Amino acid sequence: MIRARKRFGQHWLRSEAILAQIIAAAELHPGDRVLEIGPGRGALTRPLLVSGAEVVAVELDRDLCGQLRRQFDSERFQLIEGDILRLDLAPLGCNKVVANIPYNITGPLLGHLLGSIARPRRPAFERLILLVQKEIGDRLMASPGSKAYGALSVRVQFLATCEKVCAVPPRAFQPPPKVDSVVVCLRPHRTLPRVGSPQWLETLLKQGFATRRKMLANALKSLVEPEQVRQALLQLGRDANSRAEALSLEDWLALSEVLRQLQQN
């Protein structure tokens, strides 16, 4: 039996209850084409195939690829040996994603799967069921004013809705990780919020949350005059001394547009 390799961030999910909740959350039907990232030893692959869906599995570990090819002999199963971050996803034709994500690539992988505010992925996946570190899950679902709320929260919520499916304790894995995990369901928006300049919004978010304890007027001073930021916040009905973490997605969209227009005048 192949052992989990630390350099690949491998932890085998072995809880049948958690596996069942992941499959249920994916709402699979015959005709679905599922991108499975990091199939490992096939614990999720088998129920995915049982559902009647087609499965495109991407695995970096060569030894595991050999085992998976022997294990799954189905016309509905395609295995790609390689790095998911280097793979062009569009030609695969998948409409859903199911993944037990290696925690060391979570950030880049989210960008690869969802795109960005400036360059959203199109066509978008219908839904993504992702097993992630609890800290990341908290950030994806965070509300304004909370400790977990940050630029990642705003970016992801611009692109998709995010809901918790279930908590996953360390004992659900072999070997158990040192952190708690969570399964989340991401459903990309069919219609994205309107924004005058997506790149400008990205720039504001990066700068605003880089020094999150500073008032926005000071955090953004390399981009906009502090007094203009204060006036813009007041115009939007917000406190002139607001910090980045106090603003909702809607606030950021409105602030971005007001400041963009000020910059043009």
Curated annotation (Swiss-Prot):
Localization: Cytoplasm
EC number assigned by the record: 2.1.1.182
Family annotation (Pfam families): RrnaAD (PF00398)
Listed SUPFAM superfamilies: S-adenosyl-L-methionine-dependent methyltransferases (SSF53335)
Catalytic activity line of the entry: adenosine(1518)/adenosine(1519) in 16S rRNA + 4 S-adenosyl-L-methionine = N(6)-dimethyladenosine(1518)/N(6)-dimethyladenosine(1519) in 16S rRNA + 4 S-adenosyl-L-homocysteine + 4 H(+)
Main location, first listed in the record: cytoplasm
CDD domains linked to this entry: AdoMet_MTases
GO molecular function, one term: 16S rRNA (adenine(1518)-N(6)/adenine(1519)-N(6))-dimethyltransferase activity
Protein keywords: Cytoplasm, Methyltransferase, RNA-binding, rRNA processing, S-adenosyl-L-methionine, Transferase
Purpose: Specifically dimethylates two adjacent adenosines (A1518 and A1519) in the loop of a conserved hairpin near the 3'-end of 16S rRNA in the 30S particle. May play a critical role in biogenesis of 30S subunits.
Protein name as annotated: Ribosomal RNA small subunit methyltransferase A
Source species: Thermosynechococcus vestitus (strain NIES-2133 / IAM M-273 / BP-1)
The encoding gene: rsmA
